[in-house]
Amino acid sequence: MSFGGEGGREFMLDGKPFQIRSAEIHPQRVPRAYWRHRIQTAKAMGLNTIAFYVFWNQLEQPDGSWDFSGRNDIAAFIDLCQEEGMWVLFRPGPYVCGEWDLGGLPTYLIKDDVTPLRYTGNQQFMEAQTRYLEKMAEIAIPRLSRNGGPILMVQLENEYGSYKSPHDEMAYIEWLKDFWTKKGAGPFYLSEGS
C-alpha cells in the first residue's frame, strides 16, 4: 500500500489505484462462531476491507497475563479475513473509543495516578502501552501486506485530535509512529471525529 496517482492522493496497491471499501467488524464484540459469516457478508456487499479495533482492556488481564483466546484471538481473525479474500485496516489504538469502557484502555492506568493518559510524560502509561504494542506488533508485522498478509495500514491512534490534553503534544503521535516504523510497519493513518 502506498500513495500515488494524480497529485499523490490515491491509494496504490501493487502499483495500481485501489479504492478501500471497508466494513467495521470488531472481533471482540462478535462471537467467534460468527466471524466468517460477518466477513463473508461484508464481501457480498461489495466491500474489500475489514477495519477493526483491538480492545486492550479485554486482552490484558488484572493479574498482568494476556488472553488471546476466543473472541480475543486477533491473529485468527486477521487470518480469516485473508482466507476470505479481504484486506485489513488494523486499529490497535491503544485508545480506540469505540463506545467501549475507557476507550479500550485498562482501568489500572487510572487507579492511582491523575497524570493524563496518551501523554509521553506519563511513564506508567508509556511503559504499559509499550508492553501492549509489543503484543500487537507480534500479531501484525507478519500479517502486513508487504509480508504476504492482508494488513494494508496500521492506525496509529484514534480521535487524538478530538482529545484535549493539557499538554497538546504531537510527541505522543510521533512516538507511536516511531514504534511502528522500527517494527517495519507502514503506511499509517489517523482517524479523527467528523
Model-assigned labels for residue ranges:
Residues 19-23, 48-52, 88-92, 152-156, ...:
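Hydrophobic faces of well-ordered beta-strands that scaffold small-molecule active sites
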Residues 28, 32, 67, 71, ...:
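Solvent-exposed, acidic/flexible segments
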Residues 124-194:
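Active-site neighborhood of glycoside hydrolase catalytic domains
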Residues 96-138:
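Active-site-adjacent "subsite" loops/lids of carbohydrate-active enzymes
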